[in-house]
């Protein structure tokens, strides 16, 4: 029973993460496929360049909420299901497994032939449920780097690194620390083209032409 419930939660987490918010938003507002616009990503940054600020903010919030609901569902499970059915010592590991599934779904959506965004928004949503202090610290690191460089991709990578440091400093459970490492690596890998441009000095900054601006969310 425990394995069946856990497996179901992981599948639901992935399906929630897979909901293509950006794709649906742009399709509804402009009747076009966002994957054929800009960077081809379905994330909030590409929505910003394709539709505008209001739609991008809505996509950002919804993408965060998808991950929050997925992870929050696991925490709620332990309020209503006896530990004899789902062992209590599974909790942190089940939480991070579902979180990973939601993040993967955001970037590899089953509804869009396994395409999607860069998983930054969904990762932030997960962190807000795991540990709000870590989430706020990562956000502060992101904003600090953004203020200095005006490069969103570099700021996202900085935030991913900050998460790992904060998990260690705040003495989080081993499951959370391992999750932070793997999720951080995944987010950074999703930005590999951005990293290449950063090293070449060609990564666009905020305010440059939309066709040149780097996608990160």
UniProtKB/Swiss-Prot annotation:
Family assignment from sequence similarity: Belongs to the PlsY family.
Transmembrane region(s): 1-21, 54-74, 84-104, 126-146, 165-185
Protein purpose: Catalyzes the transfer of an acyl group from acyl-phosphate (acyl-PO(4)) to glycerol-3-phosphate (G3P) to form lysophosphatidic acid (LPA). This enzyme utilizes acyl-phosphate as fatty acyl donor, but not acyl-CoA or acyl-ACP.
Annotated SMART domains: G3P_acyltransf (SM01207)
Compartment(s): Cell inner membrane
Subunit text: Probably interacts with PlsX.
Annotated keywords: Cell inner membrane, Cell membrane, Lipid biosynthesis, Lipid metabolism, Membrane, Phospholipid biosynthesis, Phospholipid metabolism, Transferase, Transmembrane, Transmembrane helix
Lipid biosynthesis keyword on record: yes
Pathway entry: Lipid metabolism; phospholipid metabolism
Highest taxon in the source lineage: Bacteria
NCBIfam families for this protein: glycerol-3-phosphate 1-O-acyltransferase PlsY (TIGR00023)
GO cellular component: plasma membrane
Membrane topology: Multi-pass membrane protein
Keyword Cell inner membrane: yes
GO molecular-function terms, A-Z: acyl-phosphate glycerol-3-phosphate acyltransferase activity
The protein's name in its UniProt record: Glycerol-3-phosphate acyltransferase
InterPro entries per record: G3P_acylTferase_PlsY
Reactions it catalyzes: an acyl phosphate + sn-glycerol 3-phosphate = a 1-acyl-sn-glycero-3-phosphate + phosphate
HAMAP family: PlsY
Lineage: Bacteria, Bacillati, Cyanobacteriota, Cyanophyceae, Oscillatoriophycideae
Alphabetical GO biological process terms: phospholipid biosynthetic process
Enzyme class label: transferase
Annotated EC: 2.3.1.275
């Amino acid at each position: 029973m425990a394995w069946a419930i856990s497996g179901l939660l992981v599948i639901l987490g992935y399906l929630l993460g897979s909901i293509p918010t950006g794709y649906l938003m742009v399709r509804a507002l402009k009747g076009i496929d966002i994957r054929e616009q800009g960077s081809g990503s379905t994330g909030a940054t590409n929505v910003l360049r394709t539709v505008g600020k209001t739609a991008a903010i809505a996509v950002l919030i919804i993408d965060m909420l998808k991950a929050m609901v997925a992870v929050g569902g696991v925490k709620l499970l332990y309020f209503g299901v006896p530990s004899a059915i789902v062992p209590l010592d599974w909790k942190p590991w089940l939480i991070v497994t579902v979180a990973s599934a939601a993040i993967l779904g955001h970037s590899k959506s089953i509804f869009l032939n396994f395409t999607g965004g860069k998983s930054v928004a969904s990762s932030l949503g997960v962190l807000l449920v795991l540990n709000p202090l870590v989430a706020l610290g990562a956000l502060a690191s992101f904003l600090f780097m953004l203020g200095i460089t005006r490069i969103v991709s570099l700021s996202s990578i900085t935030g991913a690194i900050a998460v790992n440091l904060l998990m260690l400093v705040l003495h989080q459970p081993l499951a959370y620390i391992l999750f932070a490492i793997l999720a951080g690596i995944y987010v950074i890998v999703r930005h590999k083209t951005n990293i290449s441009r950063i090293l070449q000095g060609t990564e666009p900054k905020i305010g440059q032409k939309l066709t040149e601006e780097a996608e990160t969310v």
